[in-house]
């Protein structure tokens, strides 16, 4: 039985199920490691920065400042109250389910997409944990250069951003290269 077929998402045998999950285990372990790093770094931020302390890492470029973000990315939609909190929790749960489904359907040789999905799973889960537990997401990493100031973020946000960029790159360029290769085969 070929477990890479997209139509075979639910394999019939337990061997096929173990095979399908086994080779993805490394990606899931990496996602779990990123999730744990995110949660540990947020716990550090609460202890070290919560009462207004700033830590400058590289003057004029990189520092840590504790913030609580009840909204979504870059502080948008912060006025949702309790409804907004649970709306974002449900949205994040649906996103985790969708990404995991896509992850399980991705062929084993598609490392970029599998890695992107692992990053997305780690990041979404990290922020979901904060939002469900606290009602907000802990952000503390600040990057700036001159007048440019990137919104405060955390490891989960970075994971989501990198995963989304990898997935977008794959969606844009892999189909293009597949089309080019198909066109070259037609010509020859």
Report each predicted region and the residues it spans.
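Alpha-helical transmembrane bundles and membrane-interface segments of multipass inner-membrane proteins
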Residues: 2-188
């Amino acid at each position: 039985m070929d477990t890479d077929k997209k139509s075979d998402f639910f394999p019939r045998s337990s061997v096929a199920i173990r095979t399908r999950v086994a080779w993805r285990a490394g990606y899931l372990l990496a996602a779990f490691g990123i999730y744990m790093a995110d949660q540990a770094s947020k716990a550090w931020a609460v202890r070290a920065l919560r009462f207004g302390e700033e830590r400058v890492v590289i003057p004029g470029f990189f520092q840590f400042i504790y913030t609580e973000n009840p909204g979504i990315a870059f502080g948008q939609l912060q006025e949702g109250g309790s409804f907004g909190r649970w709306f974002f929790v449900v949205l994040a749960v649906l996103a985790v389910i969708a990404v995991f489904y896509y992850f399980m359907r991705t062929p084993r040789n598609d490392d970029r997409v599998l890695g992107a999905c692992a990053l997305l799973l780690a990041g979404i889960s990290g922020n979901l944990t904060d939002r469900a537990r606290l009602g907000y997401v802990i952000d503390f990493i600040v990057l700036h250069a001159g007048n440019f100031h990137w919104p405060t973020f955390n490891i989960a946000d970075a994971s989501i951003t990198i995963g989304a960029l990898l997935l977008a790159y794959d969606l844009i360029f892999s189909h293009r290269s597949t089309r080019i290769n198909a066109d070259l085969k037609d010509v020859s």
